[in-house]
Amino acid sequence: MTIDAALADKIRRTPKAELHVHIEGTLEPELIFRLAQRNHVNLPYPSVEALRAAYAFTDLQSFLDIYYAGASVLLTEEDFFDMTMDYVKRAVADNVRHAEIFFDPQTHTARGVPIGTVIDGISDALAQARTEYDFSSSLILCFLRHLSEEDAFATLEAALPYRDRFVGVGLDSSEKGNPPEKFARVFTRARELGLHLVAHAGEEGPAQYVTDALDILKVERIDHGVRSIDDAALIERLARERVALTVCPLSNQKLKVHPDLSEHPLKRMLDAGVAITLHSDDPAYFGGYMNANWEATFAALPLDAADAHKLARNSFEAAFLPPMQKAEFLAEVDHFWSATPTSPPATAPAA
């Protein structure tokens, strides 16, 4: 399926919010090698090309193995700053106006990197991005679900001196054997602290994990959530309660969650009234940032301009933004879609 040229242009230019991107997953091979040289880290790959070739993983676990290996080059505030600025430049080029960025402190503290180094480096880059690019952003601290809840508690407590730097907590890494209820107490603690709550659920795990994330963890947003399609009552609930799903199509394709994008359920869920949003997840590893995900999705599924407007709107509606700023972004989206033609203008007759 090909996209109409005018619609393709519009989905590239529409204002967007990115709500599901792991900052460590934006590490391109070139930057990994540059940081490895700067920090004298030996990589098990002889070249950038060899590292890129290793990105031929086939499932979530094989991806996570190389993901954590790539993160090993991140040691200083400057490293985290450079990684974040590289992402921001790509996001700005894709007309991302606001991003809520995941970071995994346990990946770094386990290697002896202080949590302050992680948060300061990322935060400094985002502060510069706000000034330099008018790029709105916030941070979400993610717990690694293959580790213990005690480790998550320790991470949350260690992050509290930086409480003003992040707006919420999330839950990522492998779902297998790590159900939402494993982290019930730490999510209760985060809620008491006034933090927003999100969680990965229903990617490789069942639809029941989505329900459990809502009922046990009390999350406000579901990351991935594509297995929700297996439960009609859950789909009705998501639509009724306006619970957003942060869907990552190229990630789903690469990890074989949905190998054929033409069979991806996001269009069916969108038509059912679910607040679907599109994001890049770990774009350096999955072959595409925001616009690549939008373009691949529209090429694979029967989506039109009204769907694109809805997807862009959903991304800002689901964002953890102050009401006035959210209203401004929504007005920007609505103006874009009402003011820009969705098909090429007719050619004027010759005089």
Curated annotation (Swiss-Prot):
Cross-referenced Pfam families: A_deaminase (PF00962)
Function: Catalyzes the hydrolytic deamination of adenine to hypoxanthine. Plays an important role in the purine salvage pathway and in nitrogen catabolism.
Catalytic center residues: E203 (proton donor)
E.C. number: 3.5.4.2
InterPro entries per the UniProt record, alphabetical: A_deaminase_dom, ADE, Ado/ade_deaminase, Metal_Hydrolase
SUPFAM superfamilies: Metallo-dependent hydrolases
The keyword Protein biosynthesis is assigned to this record: no
Cofactors (names): Zn(2+)
Gene Ontology MF annotations: adenine deaminase activity; zinc ion binding
Keywords linked to the UniProt accession: Hydrolase, Metal-binding, Nucleotide metabolism, Zinc
Binding site for substrate: D282
UniProt family annotation: Belongs to the metallo-dependent hydrolases superfamily. Adenosine and AMP deaminases family. Adenine deaminase type 2 subfamily.
Site (Important for catalytic activity): H224
Catalytic activity: adenine + H2O + H(+) = hypoxanthine + NH4(+)
GO BP: adenine catabolic process; hypoxanthine salvage; nucleotide metabolic process
Cofactor stoichiometry and binding remark: Binds 1 zinc ion per subunit.
UniProt xrefs under Gene3D superfamilies: Metal-dependent hydrolases
Protein name per UniProt: Adenine deaminase
Superkingdom classification of source: Bacteria
PANTHER family linked to this entry: ADENINE DEAMINASE
Natural source organism: Cupriavidus pinatubonensis (strain JMP 134 / LMG 1197) (Cupriavidus necator (strain JMP 134))
Binding site for Zn(2+): H20, H22, H200, D281
Keyword Signal set for record: no
